[in-house]
């Protein structure tokens, strides 16, 4: 019975608390390595390696297989070709375990981009992307990181609606100033 009550109460708190991103535009993005999965296959993801190929869109989400996170994953999957055209690597990160994320990478990310496990939320903490009311879980925060490792966008909003639009706009602006 308590679990039946806890989920709706947590949802109300999550919706009522504004999200924030503390990693400022222009700040150096912390490097990290994590177990990730794409299309059901696990591998090691390292931010500094991805940045050698171009900008990185790093988005944190609270939990796999929740309604908002599923919607957001679908939106990122639908826009994955746009990110590739802009030369960007897209990766989602959450405080889940790799087995659950391997399934999520196929069903909700539609095998279009990787998701990484941050089981102790250390990566989220280094980006100041933790949910204040739900310790150990990532906030819904998106970053665009230039190849030099500098943050060019920090966007936080618990609603998943604008994360794709915000990150694509930042990438297009950066790409216009840095043609290939």
Indicate where each model-derived feature is located.
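Positively charged n-region of N-terminal signal peptides that target proteins for export
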Residues: 1-4
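Bacterial N-terminal signal peptides
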Residues: 7-16
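Sec/Tat signal peptide C-region and signal peptidase I cleavage site
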Residues: 17-21
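Short loop/turn microsegments at loop-to-beta-strand junctions
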Residues: 30, 55, 139-141
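A short beta-strand-turn-helix
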Residues: 33-55
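Short active-site neighborhood of thiol/selenol oxidoreductases, capturing the structured segment around
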Residues: 47-70, 74
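Structural microenvironment flanking redox-active thiols in thiol-disulfide oxidoreductases
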Residues: 70-109, 121-123
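Thiol-/selenol-based redox modules, centered on thioredoxin-like
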Residues: 138-180
């Amino acid at each position: 019975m308590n679990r039946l009550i806890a989920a709706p109460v947590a949802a109300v708190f999550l919706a009522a608390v504004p999200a924030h991103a503390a990693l400022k535009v222009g700040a150096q993005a912390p490097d990290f390595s994590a177990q990730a999965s794409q299309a059901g296959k696990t591998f090691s993801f390292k931010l500094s390696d991805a940045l050698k190929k171009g900008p990185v869109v790093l988005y944190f989400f609270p939990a796999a297989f929740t309604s908002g996170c599923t919607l957001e994953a679908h939106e990122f999957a639908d826009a994955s070709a746009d990110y590739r055209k802009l030369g960007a690597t897209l990766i989602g990160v959450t405080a889940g375990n790799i087995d659950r994320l391997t399934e999520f990478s196929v069903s909700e990310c539609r095998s279009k981009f990787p998701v990484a496990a941050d089981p102790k939320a250390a990566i989220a903490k280094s980006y100041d992307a933790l949910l204040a009311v739900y310790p150990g879980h990532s906030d819904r925060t998106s970053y665009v990181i230039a190849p030099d490792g500098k943050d060019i966008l920090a966007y936080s909003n618990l609603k998943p609606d604008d994360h794709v639009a915000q990150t694509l706009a930042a990438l297009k602006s950066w790409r216009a100033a840095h043609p290939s």
